[in-house]
Amino acid sequence: MDLHQKLPWHPDTRSNHEGKIQGLQLRRDDVSKRKFRWVSSAGRQDGSKAECWTHLVGPPQETVIITEGPMKADVIYALTGQSVLAVPGVNSLNHLKAALQYLKENGTKQIMTAFDMDYLSNPHVTNGYRELSGILASLGLPYGTYLWNPEHKGLDDYVWEYCYHQGS
């Protein structure tokens, strides 16, 4: 499936709910330390610092999924039509509260979390999930957690595999 045909925008765009570009990430050739780096122009005239923005794919719906990684969100949305809010990483929740408040004000009634399945065993992911739970509770947003076969690390992998087998 060609994602460019399915999506009304280019999947590398990191935009807010108004469609304005918030940030730019580059994928590193050497991913042994970090896969992605935020681009910053803070030292230049009219430059901006790199921030860990959220990425909303699709319109606010009654139920919205939260996952880690904007590309995962793009894939999940393209394959399911379910709106997804992505954080750059499980411990990068700086702008999450504002994004969740926007969703709540625009009809979202429930959040389903979908962090990678290693949240069950990775203490960094577990801590991020705990912080996310606190933010959701503080906003009064009911939430649940999607679980799937851990052989598929992310929900995007699981949905892709499911769609692949449906088509064969």
Model-identified regions with their sequence ranges:
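Phosphate-handling DNA/RNA-contact segment within nucleic-acid enzymes
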Residues: 1-107
